[in-house]
Structure formats: C-alpha cells, structure tokens
Amino acid sequence: MAAAAYRAGDLLRDERYGVTHNYVGKRGIVHSEIMAPELIPAWVRDRERLWNRVEAAEFRKDSQLARVVEVGLPIELDAEERLALVREYIATEFVAQGMVADFCIRGQAHNPHAHIVLTLRGVTAEGFGPKQRNWNGKAVLHRWRAAWAECANDHLARAGHSVRIDHRTLEAQQIELMPGRRIGVARARRNDASLPEHLVERLAEQQRIARENGDTMLADPTVALRALTHQRPIFTEAELIQFLRSRTEDTNQFEAVLQAVKLCSELVSLAAGKDGTARFTSRDMVEAERSLVRRAVTMASRKGHSVPPERRGIEADAWRDAFDDLLGEGDIKTLVLADHDKSALLAAAHRAWAANGMTVEGTAPSRRAAQLLETSTGIKSRTLAEYESQWESGGELGRESVLVLDCAQGLGLKQLERLLAAADRGRAKAVLVAQAHKLGAMKVDSPFATVQRAINVEY
C-alpha cells in the first residue's frame, strides 16, 4: 500500500495494518491511472480498494504482491504522446492478458519515465483468480522488453522522429561500450555525505564505467559514432555532446573525446536541417544507404511475381495505377495511401496474389500495427522483430513469397536494409507501405523515401 501511494502521489489507507499513507502533492508525477480488462468489478479501478484486496488475497508473509515494470520514455515525445505510448503498451502487453496495471508517469525533463505496477493474479467479473506463474518466465520478460522497443519506436515514427530504441544488449548490437548503472538518486544529491553505502558504491561503479567508456571512445572515436548512429542515424552537435557527456568521466575526458570524434575521418557533415542546424552522420551510415539503394534497384529490375491483368480483379478503379504497379513485375514495390484506401487496396492485392499461387505474409514494426494490418487486409501478420528472429535462426522467405511491410516510413536504415536483404536472398517480393500523413510528418528524410526515389515510383 505504501509503495502504491508513493508512486501515484495518493492518499491510501492500509486496512491490514491500520496505517494511512499520504503522498498527495508529491512532486514530479504528471499522470496516474489504473487500466484493467473490461467487464471487471468497479472496485478494481479504486486504487485503495484494489491494493487492499491484493494484500487480503495473500496469506504467506513472504508472498509477492505485485510486479513493477519501469520504462524510460523518449524525451522527443511530448506529454500527450508519452501517455498514448504507455497506454498502448499496457493495453497490449498486460491488460490483454488479464492483468490490472496501476501506472504513473514522472515527467522530469532529463529522465521522463513510467512505473507500471501489475497484479500477479488475473481479474474477471468475479474477482481475482489464481496466480499466473507463466507471467514470471524469462521468455515473457524478454518479450516485454522487445515489445516496449517496438511500441516506442512506432510512436516515435508516428511523431516524425528518426531516433530509435534498441532493447538488445550493447554486445548484441555490436557496440563496444559498457552499459551504465541506474543510480536511483537525483543528480543534485550525489555528493551528499548522508547517502547510504550501497548508493555510494553504485556511484563509484558508474564513475568507473564512464571512465572506461571514455577511454574506449578516445582510443577509437568510431565506437562513439557507431553507438550514436545506432540510435540517431542523423544527429546534431548538441545530440553528440549530450551522448558523450553521459558516457565520460569528467569535463577533461569529455572534451578530449569530443575533439577526437570531430577530427575522426568517419564523421560526415550533411546539409543543414530546415532550421539551419548543422547535421552529421557516419561513413558507415552513408555506405548503408548506398547499399540499400543498390539492393532496391536490383530487386526492382527483376522479372516475376506479376499477376496477369485478366486475373487481377478489383472492386474499384480509384487506385488502378497503384494496384497495377503492385501486381506488376519487380521484387520491390512502394505504396503511399491514406489508411482506408491502403487497407482496401492491400486486401484486393492479397486476393490476387493468393489466387495466383503466392504466399502473402505481413509485418510491421509494432504488435499493434501488425494486428491492424491483419484485421484490415486479411494478410497473416507478425512483428518485424519476430521475422528477424526467424531469419537469424535460418528461416527464409521463398520465391513465391510476398512480404508486405506496413508503417515502412518509420523503419531505420539498417533495419530496412536487413528486411530487403532477407527478401533478396529468397528472391521474394517486398511491398513497403507508408501512410501519407505520417510520411509527411517525418522530421528527417526516411529510408523509405530513399527507396521510393531510387525505384522512381510515380502513380
């Protein structure tokens, strides 16, 4: 009860111990809410009654009462966008499984984050059921981490940002830096003599990690560029400075690393942004874009995967040019339409491809987007992360495969290149689909637009 009151900034009475916990007015909390499955008792949405019922359902002194998930929120999103992101993640990953989620968002400018407290028992119209042991498995936790990255990246793309989150370890990302430690204490208090010993030790460990990371980047500035462009393919000087400050020990080391990166031959200056701000990338990203273009041009020039005109069919002629292009020859196609038109056109194309012996599969960056693609078009769909895992395990697309990627405008350069490489290896057809209004909202040129220009799509 005390933890629930503290996180939500609420006043709650603990019936078991007869104690009232009052954290009303606690600073930094910008939103708190309880989300639960439909058709549940009204008391579930009352924080005090909910957590008193949770405590009453457990009899052992060492019982686990709840699970806490903490997620960092992208600083690029505004408060309304962050709330929408957290709600979608909770609804898809937790509430849909029968959990109750009591969450709050803390809105510090440098570290916005959300605390999500989950019940361990499913809830129905009759109340709490038995504890769900399968919610505790490592595979489930890994799925939650991957799902958070997918959902956050989807929302970042919707808001027009190119920055991306990667849930994998730095080692898996092939980034030669050590992960930092979460300190759990405000920066202003870190020199406080009254800090408990475990926090002092944690701070010392973080200082050591920052020093070693700084030494690594000083010895090889390309490490910094690889790590930064993995998050931000195009970055400003301010973003470079922010990145290096958080990964170096002190001002002297920071300035030395910054100078080394600026003098690095792998740093590439780009044309200034619309606001006049200088922008940069790395030679590795430039070569990745060239590779993407070469592959797209090669795939577009291939014959095959066409449906004869007399076997195409279509219920309306509103998208005839786009429809004919999709069903024509070539192993890569792009499509930009409003959501409603896109769904109707893809559903018609799906029927035509399937009727001509092709296997049509769908994918999207997030679980929600994949589900929407499947329900609106009938194309069986999975997340892109699930497909990538399949490809890493040896699974391949085949010559009769058509892979439809929705929300393509939000994909990063390396991820889009991996998808096209998988289609290219199997001689499959890749169909990249973007929503017109979302493509227009992108604050930087997207890899999707690069592909579209490379294959000269006009209709």
What residue spans do the PLM features occupy?
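ASCE P-loop NTPase helicase motor core
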Residues: 240, 334-459
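Interdomain "pre-motor" coupling segment immediately N-terminal to P-loop NTPase/helicase cores
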Residues: 246-309
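N-terminal nicking endonuclease/strand-transfer module with a His-rich metal-binding environment
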Residues: 1-249, 255-263, 275-279
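Pre-Walker A (Motif I) flank of P-loop NTPase domains
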Residues: 67, 328-335
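Short beta-alpha connecting loops at secondary-structure transitions
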Residues: 132-136, 272-280, 403, 430, ...
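Conserved, well-folded catalytic cores of nucleic-acid-processing
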Residues: 57, 92-96, 117-123, 151-158, ...
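N-terminal pre-P-loop "Q-motif" helix
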Residues: 313-330
